[in-house]
Amino acid sequence: MNGVETVEHNGTKYAEIIWAGTTVTETRFFSPAGSSFQFGLLAHEAGFVEPPHYHKPITRTIEDLQQMFVVQRGVVAVEFFDEHGKLFREVVLHPGDGIVLIHGTHAVRVIEDMQCISVKQGPFLGAENDKINVEVNTN
């Protein structure tokens, strides 16, 4: 698959997926400008130089915790569940595929031994503060 795909259900955006074969001719961010987590593809022609810089320290208020991971090796399934705990979608990711988990209940199932680059907002407050385990319908 190519391109960027959004996983939505009942008005909730669960995830954005960027498939490994996706290419752009210039830098492009896919997340809405107001999103607390920005992701995109950087693309420049040979010889491009970004001037030396640093990022301004600005206080930001973030109420949601989003996570992105990019599969380096292996195969991973991400399952999405509705507000009643019912599975409504499964996405299978291969090396080079990336996903941003935005809202809603999800589970990760490793199909083949995997390694992923994972990025999420900090600071880390401990699993007991960052995660809520949910009972789901397995029927």
Please place each PLM-identified region on the residue numbering.
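Conserved short histidine dyad/triad with adjacent acidic residue
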Residues: 23, 41-63
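Glycine- and acidic-residue-biased ligand/ion/polar-headgroup-sensing regions
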Residues: 45-46, 64-79
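A short, N-terminal "cap"/entry segment at the start of jelly-roll beta-barrel domains
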Residues: 1-43, 136
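A short, compositionally biased micro-patch
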Residues: 45, 71, 94, 101-102, ...
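Short acidic-glycine-tyrosine-enriched beta hairpin
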Residues: 82-103
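Double-stranded beta-helix
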Residues: 109-139
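Short beta-strand His + acidic residue motifs that chelate non-heme Fe in jelly-roll/DSBH
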Residues: 52, 78-79, 99-101, 105-111, ...
